[in-house]
Amino acid sequence: MQVSVETTQGLERRLTISVPAEQIENTVKEALKSEAKRARIPGFRPGKVPVSVINKRYGSAIRQDIMGEVMQRNFVEAIIAEKLNPAGAPTLTPGSTEGENFEFVATFEIYPEVELKGLESITVEQPTAEVTEADVDAMIETLRNQHATFEVADRAAAEGDKAKINFVGSIDGEEFEGGKADDFELQLGSGRMIPGFESGVEGHKAGEEFNIEVTFPEDYHAENLKGKVATFAITLNEVQAANLPEVNDEFATLFGITEGGIDALRAEISKNMSRELEQALKANVKEQVLNGLVEQNDIELPTALINGEVEVLRKQAMQRFGDQAANMPELPADLFTEQAARRVKVGLLLGEVIKTNELKAEDERVQGLIASMASAYEDPSEVVAYYNGNEELMQNMRNVALEEQAVEALLKTATLTEKAVNFEEFMNKATGRA
């Protein structure tokens, strides 16, 4: 086998591989003989079909299969010999089969050589927060509102009430699509409508007709409404006041607390909020570290890896549409290209961090991650056992642990400053509610 390597552009390589034609011919002959022994052809006894008949019937297909096998096998041998690391499947193009040698071309991309830079220039503002009794009180109030009952009230609408309304929206005197509804039920203060709409209903009684003027946000999803001033003609049909459950031991049973009453509920809420806070704090620091790593290191990315990641993201996006996905056109690749490229870049850079620091997933950390995740379930021990019995899930958790360890390694050389933050504000921002 003879091999020549050519750099076509960037990470793309072209291998021209030459294999003795005799090697292929001998393999074809053996394959024809083997097929002749197995073939069942009318007019010939089993195992007695002449090779010439087999060649006439199946020779072309057999030769194509063998050429494919020869190309694949010799490609693997060539990249090992040339110490090349393909980033994707090669395109194999057969050349001439005449003469003494069979020549083919393999075109593919290789992984880039990654040399980490600027790790000392990464800056991280490390948020610190804790769950206070006031935060637990606020969560209990949220739970009370979620379990509220409503009854018709003969008074002006206020925040927390439900209002049934008819409304017609217009811009410059013209109604717009989607701006009209009858008997629309809205909980005031929920933030469901654009700013100013819900507060504009407050203070009015059932039977009143009135107008409110609001401005659509600049980032509103409908392009034709962004930043526009609209007038809504509203009829308030009914006001319903909320009846909130009392905070007592009976209230605690709504959340599976059978012993310890409201004190046990508060302890459980505090534990869950603390777990969510810890996860959000770690995610915030991780995002800053990765942003810094990406900014400090500019590397060439294999198109094959980006395309593969695009397909993963596209599939995930389609799955979120559920049954509707079957009736939808395929989402265009350019919707995901930027995110896919970042994922590939982060993966390559973290891989080098792991390699440089000789990191291996720590068993204790892996089990800690599983235990933390399982604690959110009714029977944590069952979840832990399930994970430990599933190698694919365990490998996923090892990868998460390795990523954590890589981020911690980067933090050792980064510049850190602590900043105290408010629990509610931080969590709202972390979950996109800010």
Curated annotation (Swiss-Prot):
It holds the Pfam family Trigger_C. It comes from the Bacteria. Keywords: Cell cycle, Cell division, Chaperone, Cytoplasm, Isomerase, Rotamase. Its EC number is 5.2.1.8. Residues 160-245 form the PPIase FKBP-type domain. Its main location: cytoplasm. It is found in: Cytoplasm. One of its GO terms (biological process) is cell division. It catalyses: [protein]-peptidylproline (omega=180) = [protein]-peptidylproline (omega=0). The keyword Mitochondrion does not apply. One of its GO terms (molecular function) is ribosome binding. SUPFAM superfamilies: FKBP-like, Triger factor/SurA peptide-binding domain-like, Trigger factor ribosome-binding domain. One of its GO terms (cellular component) is cytoplasm. The keyword NAD does not apply. Involved in protein export. Acts as a chaperone by maintaining the newly synthesized protein in an open conformation. Functions as a peptidyl-prolyl cis-trans isomerase. Belongs to the FKBP-type PPIase family. Tig subfamily. Consists of 3 domains; the N-terminus binds the ribosome, the middle domain has PPIase activity, while the C-terminus has intrinsic chaperone activity on its own. PANTHER family: TRIGGER FACTOR CHAPERONE AND PEPTIDYL-PROLYL CIS/TRANS ISOMERASE, TRIGGER FACTOR-LIKE PROTEIN TIG, CHLOROPLASTIC. This is Trigger factor. The gene is tig.
